[in-house]
Swiss-Prot record:
Principal EC category: hydrolase
NCBIfam families registered for this protein in UniProt: xseA (TIGR00237)
Family that this chain belongs to: Belongs to the XseA family.
The protein's name: Exodeoxyribonuclease 7 large subunit
GO biological process: DNA catabolic process
Entry-linked Pfam families: Exonuc_VII_L (PF02601), tRNA_anti_2 (PF13742)
Subcellular localization(s) per the UniProt record: Cytoplasm
GO molecular function terms noted in the UniProt entry: exodeoxyribonuclease VII activity; nucleic acid binding
Catalytic activity: Exonucleolytic cleavage in either 5'- to 3'- or 3'- to 5'-direction to yield nucleoside 5'-phosphates
Organism whose genome encodes this protein: Clostridium botulinum (strain Loch Maree / Type A3)
Length: 401
């Protein structure tokens, strides 16, 4: 007995709604092997998950794929988290994946975090223990695979920055069971080379299993106990290993490690030239400033030197002498004029000038001028003064007018 006849679309929608309402299918965690992997240009990822007996189609949209911590590959065992639903257009159900993790990787992460916490408590990560990276290394020791991309990158970067730096390469395994041992041996060997300034411990990117050799406890202690500073450049920027926390400097890539270890010769030359230029300018400015001070003090010294003081005093004396002469001359001229005026005045009142007109002067014997006849009565002798001489006379008589 049929309850209702449905269209294909109605059937697919009904199945979709039924699946979407199921709690388990909406919180599915599915383990399987990746196959038919396709990464679309839009960023969406399409693939299948399979096991020994079956498979299911999967899709992971770009917004979720962006947060993946590892690159997907066919044959990779994963655990996919998401929800099962129907693609109505095709009538097929598939797993819509929201997150994914590597199958079996969980145990490695637990071991990683456990060792990390242990070494942290023991002080291997303390900044106080980290050695200073030398600025001008002449010889760099490199521990890595002699055939990998890492050593090529390190060589290229070092040659580009400074062809004068020598690289001493210790060939080591960088993954596998014996890798940690060869890395430890490399550290010990390069520590014995006296002129090695710094060590780079490096390898290219890889999965957590491929990088696991760098999460070894003995290797961590070898890095910690190294007398020479160690830069680690393991994997890509997002990859962190135990020795990255122990090393003196962690670089995101092998190339970046070489950038840190090898100083750029051209940059150094330019810096030296800039320092030289700045020092030259500074010295010229200092010399100019001191010369100005010197000239100023020289002027002050010259202005206050005994020679200049004496010369100034001589000039002052000459000026005073000239002024004195002028004043004396002026005073003499003034007095001369006064004398001339008084002489003229005296000359005008000189009694002798009257005598030139025919007059005479009468004096007694005491040279006292006699102006009245009464004075003659008591005198016997008088002096008569002429314009050109004098005569002594005796008085015989006095006649009244």
């Amino acid at each position: 007995m049929h309850i209702k006849t449905l269209t294909v679309s109605q059937l697919n929608r009904y199945v979709k709604n039924t699946l979407d309402a199921d709690f388990i299918l909406n919180n599915a965690s599915v383990k399987g092997e990746i196959s038919n992997l396709k990464i679309h240009s839009s960023g969406h990822i399409y693939f299948s998950l399979k096991d020994g007996g079956s498979k299911i189609n999967c899709v992971m949209f770009k917004s979720y794929a962006y947060n993946l911590k590892f690159a997907l590959e066919n044959g990779m065992d994963v655990v996919a988290l998401g929800n099962v639903s129907v693609y109505e257009k095709e009538g097929s159900y598939q797993l819509y994946v929201k997150d994914m993790k590597r199958e079996g990787i969980g145990d490695l992460y637990v071991a990683f975090e456990k060792l990390k916490e242990k070494l942290k408590e023991e002080g291997l990560f303390d900044d106080a223990h980290k050695k200073e990276i030398p600025k001008f290394s002449k010889k760099i020791g490199v521990i890595t695979s002699p055939t990998g991309a890492a050593i090529k990158d390190i060589i290229n970067v070092t040659k580009r920055r400074n062809k004068g730096i020598e690289l001493l390469i210790y060939p080591a395994l960088v993954q596998g069971t014996d890798a940690s041992k060869t890395l430890i041996e490399g550290i010990k060997t390069l520590n014995k080379v006296e002129d090695v300034d710094i060590i780079i411990l490096a390898r290219g990117g890889g999965s957590i299993e491929e990088l696991w050799a760098f999460n070894n406890e003995e290797l961590a202690y070898a890095v910690y106990n190294s007398k020479k500073p160690i830069i680690t450049g393991v994997g890509h920027e997002t990859d962190f290993t135990i020795i990255d926390f122990v090393s003196d400097r962690r670089a995101p890539t092998p190339s970046a490690a070489a950038e840190i270890a090898a100083f750029d010769r051209e940059v150094l030359i330019n810096e030296i030239l800039n320092y030289k230029y700045n020092i030259k300018n500074s010295m010229e400015n200092i010399i100019k400033e001191k010369r100005n001070y010197l000239n100023l003090y020289k002027q002050k010294i010259e202005a206050n030197s005994p020679t200049n003081i004496i010369a100034n005093e001589y000039r002052n004396i000459d000026n005073l002498k000239e002024l004195l002469n002028m004043k004396i001359e002026g005073k003499l001229n003034k007095e001369k004029n006064n004398l001339s005026r008084l002489s003229s005045l005296l000359e005008a009142h000189n009694p002798l000038n009257v005598l030139k007109k025919g007059y005479t002067l009468i004096e007694d014997e005491g040279n006292n001028l006699i102006t009245e006849k009464e004075a003659l009565k008591e005198l016997n002798k008088i002096n008569i003064i002429f314009k050109d001489g004098r005569a002594k006379l005796s008085i015989k008589y006095i006649e009244e007018f």
